């Protein structure tokens, strides 16, 4: 049977008219007067009593120990309000454990064996639940893959989760759930299975839980609530058609004595007022909230241009309140949001609370989208400068403001929904988060979803172990994306436009957001990530333990007096007139870490007096690398910061530290996180990193990385989090199109600058080398390319391209790529560029012979060697063959970029000059160890010519990393011209 609290009974008698205190207990009776000796049974009955007594004096409803199974959500309205001098309080009596439950106890179940360790029992007809609690712990639904606490994504994921081979085992999967990561790991998405086709293809609906939707991630996906997947201890399945509960009890669980609970309600307590008639001065104190249903399929509402959608609800729900307080409560294992603060709320405080294992957000503040003057969505490109609403600030007051989250411990939120945060702030103003410890979460610890309307303060918080299941994010994340961002007709990099329109950038971000005196650590992103136009921020006294600090786009950011341990400052895609200030910080890297386009003019408004830490540095010296990049930093230095005790997390600097002379001011290292003794005793703290000992003198060295070309476009590998964020990629992989000349083969195929190549012929492309391998394997057949452009995937086809074949032989007797006879070759004159080749004379490269020697080789460490061939006149080139010898078993590999020029006179050696030279092919055979001799052949698809050129340059790069870089022992170069037509 299902046991619920007793129903409300009897009206309130006159005997309670002057009472200030009421009592409730699960073993009480609603027929009782509500005294400590004769308490009520239900909270609804106690609420009636409090309503009658409120307003004349403080009213307190004391809850005695036990579980209060709510028949329906307990709803407070303006009729429940107190006053400043006569507040209304609902609290646990003498700290007794009082639990508010949205569930139901399943009693007297008769368990019997089913199979393979699984038991079954009949439950009341009509019972539905999406969670099962056994002895107070939520158990996993029957799922695939099985739950594994050590797996990063979903505690178990598999690419074949919904493959036909898998689903063929499922008789009726309707009602099952699919959970998957966004393709770019920007949160999660969820689906309900609606059926299965005859070909075992699953039918489903959902995926709307992300404001920038995508296909499911190919690897990070799982299914649950599938009967046939019930195969691991702890898993359960409820067959609602037969009202049968199946459970695989873990070792040590005795179901004859265990407490079994199902979940019924989404919301446990609701505060439902309005701006005109708010719920006022009501406190909830010292209670435990448990058994709230999951709401991931109701998470549908897009939140303007953040990446989020939301469900406006939670275990504790506030809308339309003034001066209410949630204090010293434990919100445990609720299925959706723990606390949701919706639309109009003023001076709401959440203090001293312990929030653990929520399915959704910890505490979410979300205002009304219609309070924004320009509530644009991602697909809305209709706004234009000429018609823009230029009125600063919000349009209405229907949003949270002047609210506080104080001294709270919040961890392991986002157990189900991955686009969530322990503290979420969106369409709000003046939210303060103070002395909170936040950790073990899938995405950011604190997220501010837009610039509307600022005034938030994040201080003395300890936030770490974040972004554990997602990517391209930080322990703190914010987006701006305000009225000015991406506005049609507005170019804020233009000097005149900036002068005339600079006020636009603070129309929404009307108040400054302050982050101060916090400790952050993110091992899967940035410690602090001010993303996509985040503007009007002040960051002071932040200790960043791992991921550094990022500013992307945006305006008016002050970055001062922060410490970036083992990392540095990441400026991404700055506006020319950003007005950013970066000063008096301590960092590890001797250079900035930009991504995307940075202005050619001096960066920001001020970048100076920063210190690059070098332990045991004898004397401070200029931070030349910072200064060269920013064109500022005239007074920034490299020096020993002289930390007090960094191994123990004390990054204050000692007296006499050079940082103090730069304006750095010590800030406390012992006030991060919760201060409440009960919470501090159980709160974790971050691992203090082992300090890196950076090298380098701060000067910028010339880049030794060779330039890469594909289809005559310059490309490079995607590198690191910066690129992933700058180009909005699904991972830290791909090939970026750096430059796509108008007449290049890439341009003809439809490629553009800043395209990122993610796949070729269905195979993931992680690097340039991988792309070249796939291209060469295709040997002239059309290439199907998946391109990432402006957050979308675009299919392109490349039919016209050069490719290479390679042959290895133990002797000069090549079969597929033999030395061509003289009659097929273009006569040529060979030259070597500075610093000149060694050993054999350069002329041997065109003598028609292969030898076992070094050939005209470049010295070790020469990274810019080049050979140039003059054909005497421009000729149509059918094939280029290049031969090498594996001298000393390490010089046979070929690594060069082949360039061509049709200039009538010698074009010189600067192959990078696209006016004179065209890149023909990028070749690298290092992947396969050579035998004695190596031959390569470069041809064009469709038996077309490689081009019409007189001059050819082989820009060679060392083929090994030994001895400073050993160059290839080239033996012969042959040019086969196209037959005359």
Regions found by a protein language model. Give the residues of each.
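Right-handed parallel beta-helix
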Residues: 280-291, 322-336, 345-360, 369-391, ...
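C-terminal, low-ordered peptide segments at domain boundaries
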Residues: 702-728, 784, 791-815
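PDZ/PDZ-like domain segments forming the peptide/carboxylate-binding groove
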Residues: 716-759, 763-766
